[in-house]
Amino acid sequence: MAEKYPDVYFSHGTGYMSNGKNFNNYFGRSYQARYLSGIVAGMNTKDNKIGYVAAQDSSNSEVPGGIAAFAIGVESVNPKAKIYVDVTNSWYDEKKEKKASERLLNMGCDVMTQHCDTPYPQTLAQEKGVYGIGYNSDMSKETPDSCLTSVIWNWSAYYTSAVYH
């Protein structure tokens, strides 16, 4: 599209490609929110087992960076807690995320978080009576009894700046 419309500026949220002319990408510092959500998880686990459903492995730096920041947050308040990661290799796959969540819950994880896009890790956490930390949407509406917090984006400051500059 950018090549077809050279006088229009395109910007892709959470992307990684650019043409150096009229197409760029932008991203936030998700590790900051991951660190804070790790603190929340570390303060709320009773059994010191925290489940993390991850969309990608180390081939995508965003995900392991988020896991590391989350782990540092957990460790800062609860050095005895362990984080168990299950990788789906997909950003959005209901079946894989459900199975990964079930595996972690069956291991005894009493706090669940995610870096993937279906609500399954959170809805299953609520069904099992454990806490959850959502991602990319406010899960407090869908899982009001279990949601501790959610890592979500508010792009309004970027959009305002991009439009006016």
Labelled PLM ranges:
Residues 1-165:
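A residue-level marker of the well-folded mature domains of exported/periplasmic proteins
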